[in-house]
């Protein structure tokens, strides 16, 4: 992932302003440590921090059209860039970068070209011919993006809050699947799939079609000129990503450059479910497997850095981001710059355990629609920022546009969870890859119960976080929570603890509004809480809160009051710039 910052229509075009823009852009340097660039035209600045993945030698940004009157700063990967180049025979490209097509497509097709892009992206394009600009974000918000407005009438656009939060009077999340145009001074939705209306689809389920679509989604994401690997927790989603990657890697350009031996990575507490399952899958697939161990105290020591980088106070996201944040640093230290990950599957197929209680296929489908629309606030945010904190890029094939549109066109009756018929969560995805002749995975892995990432790294991780918060947030503080935090008032001590840290980094009112709120159980939306009356008594985002569903649900688990937060001797992470020494097993 790269980092982009644009300041458009500012009243000050002095050298001091340029220096300030560069200073703010450097706050995003963790996202793109390989190169930095800036383009200044009149009252507009485009800045870029580059993570070089495709064409590392010549793809520096900002990028331009032939006469340099159209400039663009991009964070993303355009997987169909070669096909798009073929549509532009009269254009000359300066680089081999996949993002180089954007300025030329705009010159040829105007603002509507965004629909032609297949990939993950956020960009700002400046047309100096008429001093206008557009900005756009990918369909699901895989890449992070924010927009703000200054008192001088300027528009600010940044990959992260930290690039603009103390320069703008007001700022907000740039909505996924939208284009912002200076000509209209407003947003237009460019991604309008049939499922977005939440109408109930009726296409029959075809396992081979679904399998083929996912394999193509993975193959697209093997476009790289740098070393890469896969994140492998041993759960269904990451295991399928690893299995398909391993099966199709040989013969690709990436394999010719870096070899066909796939590397896989897993993180967890000693003895965690993910470490055990991840190693088993890695052994089955023959990957070079790397395990990263952390302790509860390691994670607690990193919480402040995690909140600074992830830019949220959402409990679920912070729980899951912390081990991913720790793992990403170690992956990058091994020389890897890109990983393929399994985010998005649970939202598309109703994989969260609370979907067991969906009353009918209509409610099931509408909830999946709501979950996909909110991905940019949760799992996409985590996957993007936890990896980008260390200059690592995460690609997510389950959020391929074509794959999502296909999967969301299937009659949701096929997705319904029916234990009496042997259909557990994500049954249609499991069935699609249940190949007796050429198995992708062992049966017990293919049908392993869903674990949320924050649960799978080790159940004591969440319990340890709660115990730590108990020591730092008093009952009196909780009584006054509604007065201190009137918006999205924290309902638990853990939530209060995260909120205090967040507001120390991002004190503006606009910042707190960028984070979603509302009741949730096991990652549900507020609407789905009504599916089971008992859930309102235990609004915890852990999958174990889905009582009566998870094998290790909270009703069978040790209560938090019996746990103590304990200082571990093995590791101290310190702050973000200090060394972290996690145990590595390869």
UniProtKB/Swiss-Prot annotation:
Residues 2-185 form the Glutamine amidotransferase type-2 domain. GO terms for cellular component: cytosol. Residues 193-516 form the Asparagine synthetase domain. L-glutamine binds at residues 50-54, 75-77, 98. The keyword Transcription regulation does not apply. Signal peptide: none annotated. PROSITE patterns: GATASE_TYPE_2. Gene3D superfamilies: Glutamine Phosphoribosylpyrophosphate, subunit 1, domain 1 (3.60.20.10), HUPs (3.40.50.620). This is Asparagine synthetase [glutamine-hydrolyzing]. The lineage of its organism: Eukaryota, Viridiplantae, Streptophyta, Embryophyta, Tracheophyta.
């Amino acid at each position: 992932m790269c980092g982009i910052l644009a300041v458009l229509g500012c009243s000050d075009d002095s050298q001091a302003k340029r220096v300030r823009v560069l200073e703010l852009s450097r706050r995003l340097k963790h996202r793109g440590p390989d190169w930095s660039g800036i383009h200044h035209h009149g009252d507009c600045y485009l800045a870029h921090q580059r993570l070089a993945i495709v064409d590392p030698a010549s793809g520096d940004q900002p990028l331009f059209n032939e006469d340099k009157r159209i400039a663009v700063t991009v964070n993303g990967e355009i997987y169909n860039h070669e096909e798009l180049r073929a549509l532009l025979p009269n254009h000359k490209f300066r680089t081999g970068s996949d993002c180089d097509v954007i300025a030329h497509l705009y010159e040829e097709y105007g603002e509507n070209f965004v629909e032609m892009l297949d990939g993950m992206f956020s960009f700002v394009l400046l047309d100096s011919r008429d001093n206008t600009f557009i900005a756009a974000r990918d369909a699901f918000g895989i890449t992070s993006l924010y927009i703000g407005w200054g008192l001088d009438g300027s528009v600010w656009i940044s990959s992260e809050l930290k690039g603009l939060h103390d320069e703008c009077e007001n700022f907000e999340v740039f909505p996924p699947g939208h284009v912002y145009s200076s000509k209209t001074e407003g947003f237009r939705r460019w991604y309008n799939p049939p499922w977005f209306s939440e109408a109930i689809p009726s296409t029959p389920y075809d396992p081979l079609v679904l399998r083929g679509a996912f394999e193509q989604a993975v193959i697209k994401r093997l476009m790289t000129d740098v070393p890469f690997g896969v994140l492998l927790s041993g759960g269904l989603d990451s295991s399928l990503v690893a299995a398909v990657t391993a099966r199709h890697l040989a013969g690709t350009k990436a394999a010719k450059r870096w070899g066909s031996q796939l590397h896989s990575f897993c993180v967890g507490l000693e003895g965690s479910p993910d470490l055990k399952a991840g190693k088993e899958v890695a052994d089955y697939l023959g990957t070079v497997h790397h395990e990263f161990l952390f302790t509860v105290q390691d994670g607690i020591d990193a919480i402040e850095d995690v909140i600074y980088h992830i830019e949220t106070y959402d409990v679920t996201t912070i729980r899951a981001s912390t081990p991913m944040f720790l793992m990403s640093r170690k992956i990058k230290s091994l020389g890897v710059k890109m990983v393929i990950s399994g985010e998005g599957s649970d939202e598309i197929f109703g994989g969260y355990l609370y979907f067991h209680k969906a009353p009918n296929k209509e409610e099931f489908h509408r909830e999946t629609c709501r979950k996909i629309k909110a991905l940019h606030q949760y799992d996409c945010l985590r996957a993007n920022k936890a990896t980008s904190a260390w200059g690592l890029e995460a690609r997510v094939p389950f959020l391929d546009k074509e794959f999502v549109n296909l999967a969301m066109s299937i009659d949701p009756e096929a997705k319904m969870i029916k234990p009496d018929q042997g259909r557990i969560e994500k049954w249609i995805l499991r069935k699609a890859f249940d190949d007796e002749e050429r198995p992708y995975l062992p049966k017990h892995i293919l049908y392993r119960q869903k674990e949320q990432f924050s649960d799978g790294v080790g159940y004591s991780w969440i319990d340890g976080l709660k115990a730590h918060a108990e020591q730092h947030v008093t009952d009196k503080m909780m009584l006054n929570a509604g007065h201190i935090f009137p918006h999205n008032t924290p309902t638990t001590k853990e939530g209060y603890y995260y909120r205090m840290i967040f507001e120390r980094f991002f004190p503006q009112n606009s910042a707190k509004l960028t984070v979603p709120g509302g009741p949730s159980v096991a990652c549900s939306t507020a609407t789905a809480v009504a599916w089971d009356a008992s859930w309102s008594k235990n609004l915890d985002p852990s999958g174990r809160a889905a009582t009566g569903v998870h094998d290790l649900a909270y009703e069978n688990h040790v209560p938090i009051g019996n746990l103590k937060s304990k200082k571990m001797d093995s590791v101290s992470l310190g702050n973000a710039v200090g060394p972290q020494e996690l145990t590595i097993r390869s």
